[in-house]
Amino acid sequence: LLLVNQLMDLRKNQSGNLQLRVSHNDLYLFTQEIYISFNQIAVKERITFRLESDESGIDAWFDRVLLEKVFFNLLSNAFKHTAPDESITIRLQLFSVAGLQEQFPGRISGEVRGTSRYVCLSVEDTGKGIDDSDKFHIFSPFYQGTDESESNTAGTGIGLSLVLSIVKLHKGVVWVEDNKPKGAVFRVLIPVNREA
């Protein structure tokens, strides 16, 4: 059923019919609900799982249903590629545009503008990481990483493409980078103001 829903969402996006329905919410509480729902998996898999935030209340305009799909895909991938006794962290940080340019130089030039504040949603893991050759294609529809074909947990290659589409609908940016000393970090920037 999940695969069918993701295919339908991908198809809607390709045809221009994936609609954004934003409402005013507390992004921290929303993220905390998602954290709680994944915590059982972390306990079962013996993975250290944390939620860290600059602020305990983050007023933002976003589509709850679609942003939940972003979190679900990013966290599902993190859990799939993180072994027992490793860790996964969800991190929320608020930035001005100037703060973003200082924190992530060269990452967001031209894609983030205006006076809006942005929230950076990061999913960080200490798993096996992502090959450099895969980083350029990882958000393409149906792309599977080089190690996926040899894995018994191979995905469909739809999830990260859907993440990119949803983030763009929110007028945001998403990318992946290495987590030091090992693992991967997916960062999602979305504006918190309705006007954005």
Where are these regions (language model features)?
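Coiled-coil phosphoacceptor/dimerization helix of two-component systems
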Residues: 1-10, 30
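Helix-loop junction within the histidine kinase core
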Residues: 11-22
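ATPase catalytic-site recognition across NTP-hydrolyzing enzymes
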Residues: 136-140
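Short alpha-helical Gxxx[C/S/T] motif in the catalytic ATP-binding
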Residues: 154, 159, 163
